[in-house]
Regions:
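Terminal leader/tail segments of proteins
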Residues: 1-98
């Protein structure tokens, strides 16, 4: 297993967040809120098998979801933000994450 860190960053305002890997729910939590001082709402740590996966993040209360294919070995940390009405998933944008 390979550790995967998902940093829920900008735009969360008391949301319920659901995270699935390859169609299997791995995380569900309500009340996720971005702490503006640090630009982070929650750090989620999961273990995944090596190889390619599909990450799906949904905000049921906002009726939106985002999806991204990633490689567990080359992308051990991903950032998730809710920006301009959509979920953005990508590499961390703040220095010092690695």
């Amino acid at each position: 297993m390979i550790p995967l860190t998902l940093d829920l960053q900008e735009g969360f305002e008391g949301d319920q967040v659901v995270i699935a890997i390859d169609g299997h729910e791995q995380f569900r939590k309500s009340g996720i809120r971005t702490r503006l001082q640090i630009g982070l709402a929650e750090r989620v740590r999961l273990d995944v098998e090596p190889g390619q996966h599909i990450l799906n993040v949904s905000l049921p209360g906002r009726n939106t979801q985002g999806e991204r294919r990633f490689d567990a070995a080359s992308e051990p940390i991903l950032a998730v933000s809710f920006v301009e009405g959509r979920i953005d998933i990508g590499p961390p944008r703040a220095p010092g994450y690695l």
